[in-house]
Structures are given as C-alpha cells and as structure tokens.
C-alpha cells in the first residue's frame, strides 16, 4: 500500500492521502480550538489534539473529506502528548466538523478511537439578527425565560450562545410574521443570569453564520449569582453530591442525638421526682402516725363504784357514828373506748 505525503508549509502540517487505518485500538484523545470554534473569516485558529496516552502521531480529519487526513508528530510534556494543527487563514472551505486520532510508531495503521466532534464555524458573513427577552432582561427568580432571535433576513436556522458554554442551542426559524423570521428559545425557570448572543444561518451552508447579535444580559433578581452555571462545568453552589450526603447524614445524627438527650433528661427528671414524692409520702405517713398518737391517745376510763348506792345499810345518827373515819374501797374498772372518765365511789 502506497501513501502519498504532501507537505503544506502554509498551515504547518502534512496531508496524508491513502487508505484509512484501523481505528479504536486506544482510547480517544481530546480536540480543542484556540481561541475558539467560532472564527471570523481570514482569522487564525489552532486545533489542538491531546491525550494522556503517549501517542507518537496525531491525525486530524474533517468530515466529508474521506481522502484527506492531516498528520503531525506528537509532542510529549508532563505526561501529556499533543499536537497543534494551525490554520493561518480560515476560509469557508476549511470550516466544518473535525475529529482527531492518535497512533503509535510500531503500529501506524492502528489508531485510537476518534475524539468528540468539533465544529469550526465562520461568523460575520451576513446581517446580524436581533435578540430580546419576552419578559424583559430583568426577571424574578423562578419565572420562565424565553429569548427571541429575529431578523428580516430569511434565515433557516437560529443559534443561541451563552458566554462560558461550549455549545449553542439551535432552532429553526418560524414563519414570517410582520416582516421578520423568528425563533423563540425557552430557557425554563430563571435561576441565574447570563450574557447571550444569537446568529442566523442557511441550510445549504450550516458552517457559515451571520454576524453576532448585540449581547443581551439577562439578570435574575432574588438570586445573589449573576452567571448561569455551565452544564459542562460544576457549580460551586451545587456542591459535590458526596459532600451533600455527608452533610445531610451529619445533620440527621445531630438531630437524633439532641432528641435522645432530651428524652433521657426527661426520663431522669421524672424518676427523680417520683423518688422525692415517695420520700415525702413516707414522711407524711410517719408524721400523721405520731400526731395521732399525741393528739388522740387511748383514753382509759376509770369508774369508781360507790357501793353505798347499791347496798342497804342502817343510817345512824352522827353522834352514834364511830370516830375513826371509814375506809372507803375504791374499785376501778377499765372501760375500753370510753370518751370520758367517771368515778364511782363504792362504800363498804
């Protein structure tokens, strides 16, 4: 198999014609455009193909050009291999979708999987469209935002870009209304602001766009951030899901610990109060018992029976009574549960 290698000094790379090698042996490299993939006519653009695999060569391919492949020797720096494909003057013929591949020296016909596609577009060729926000450039957080791109030129497609994003949204132009062709881009509920631009293009030249519209700054009130997070870049406000799970788990543990401490404290308080009440009840019972013994002693009723009442004897005159005093016999009878004491004198 013969290969025809043609040196192209104006762009600093080689053009390789021949059979397409077998691909997919190594993992895909990455393809970037500097200063960007939207390039004005006659400007310089550099397409950089790089990988952490130490490729000896890099190949650049443009879709639709099956017989042409651009090849460069890779440079190795800090564990990365790369090659810069420089296009000094961008023209309409060089615009299109590019991919790059990597290969090693010992198997030049076995290349890596292709990189993700990169569209190189020439802008500034046609009249610029107009970009507006249906609710105005300042909206409340949560309101639905719709941006309208319109022009009197009969563009078939409109492209909406936002600063910081690598890819654009695109929508076909609607029917002509009031002399303009328009496309409405719904962005959904507003959470962050951003700067937007739109372009117009035709079906027969999808890589040739109009001039950029005037920039439109969309501001969202009620939100401290003024920039919309890019879908390809992580947001610092969103945070790492793992860290978020750790934060939620820690919060749950703290709440459970507080509840457990509260329940334990309440249980100990109830137990202490119950012990104090038992001691007070025992003291009250002892005090009541002592008061009962002091205030209500068992009264013993003594009854002194006077047998004079129950015996009959002869009453003598005082002069006839003996001079020695009589001896009275006193009999005490203990009457249980008596409330008073009575004394009955018994006479002999």
Curated annotation (Swiss-Prot):
Ranges for domain Ig-like C2-type: 42-107, 142-205
Membrane topology: Single-pass type I membrane protein
One GO CC term, this protein: plasma membrane
GO annotation terms (biological process): immune response; immune response-regulating signaling pathway; natural killer cell inhibitory signaling pathway
Keywords of the record: Cell membrane, Disulfide bond, Glycoprotein, Immunoglobulin domain, Membrane, Receptor, Repeat, Signal, Transmembrane, Transmembrane helix
InterPro entries according to UniProt: Ig-like_dom_sf (IPR036179), Ig-like_fold (IPR013783), Ig-like_Receptors_ImmuneReg (IPR050412), Ig_sub (IPR003599), Immunoglobulin_dom (IPR013151)
Top-level taxon: Eukaryota
Name of protein: Killer cell immunoglobulin-like receptor 2DL1
